[in-house]
Amino acid sequence: MKVTKSEIVISAVKPEQYPEGGLPEIALAGRSNVGKSSFINTMINRKNLARTSSKPGKTQTLNFYIINDVLHFVDVPGYGFAKVSKTEREAWGRMIETYLTSREELKAVVQIVDLRHAPSQDDVMMYDFLKHYEIPVIVIATKADKIPKGKWEKHAKVVKETLNIEKEDRLILFSSETKKGKQEAWSAIEQMIAR
């Protein structure tokens, strides 16, 4: 998809704040600081529409971005960050669960993991949650530029095995620095929207 227009629509915390209009939605989920904002900015050719932060746990709302007036990206709060209170974590958990399990416009979740490391227990729980609710998922392993090309396959195998990725689910190696995987990610997203 050639992105010519993108903007943030709303930062929502409850269903009545979600945008109306019935556009398909792709949610982006991942551990805090895994590079979700960089992924969004790379996909839409913008430097900082999605704010990148060195402070993990910065996104505390569901941020809806409209792309070319045909689709929403929904940035979900990062999971697995310890420096917020248990109450806050539980509130985020409920907000995310409500959105993921009840939003009709949701077509798929892009789950972002760090290619350099084996997925965390939180990553595994998120993937299992999506499979349990039969929510289509695309796994994006980001920061591919940070490891030598010769080791990509080995790292990808660790991601696949740790998450126990099912055959029908795509694993795409991605880098916001080099734009590797950008076209492949768009084509996977477009397939999900067309379903």
UniProtKB/Swiss-Prot annotation:
Keywords: Cell cycle, Cell division, GTP-binding, Magnesium, Metal-binding, Nucleotide-binding, Septation
Chain ranges of the EngB-type G domain: 22-195
A Pfam entry, by short name: MMR_HSR1
Signal sequence coordinates: none
GO cellular component, one term: cytosol
Sample GO molecular function, one term: GTP binding
tRNA-binding recorded as keyword: no
Binding residues for Mg(2+): 37, 59
Keyword Magnesium: yes
SUPFAM superfamilies in the cross-refs: P-loop containing nucleoside triphosphate hydrolases (SSF52540)
Superkingdom of origin organism: Bacteria
Required cofactor names: Mg(2+)
Residue positions binding GTP: 30-37, 57-61, 75-78, 142-145, 174-176
Function: Necessary for normal cell division and for the maintenance of normal septation.
UniProt similarity note: Belongs to the TRAFAC class TrmE-Era-EngA-EngB-Septin-like GTPase superfamily. EngB GTPase family.
Protein name in the entry: Probable GTP-binding protein EngB
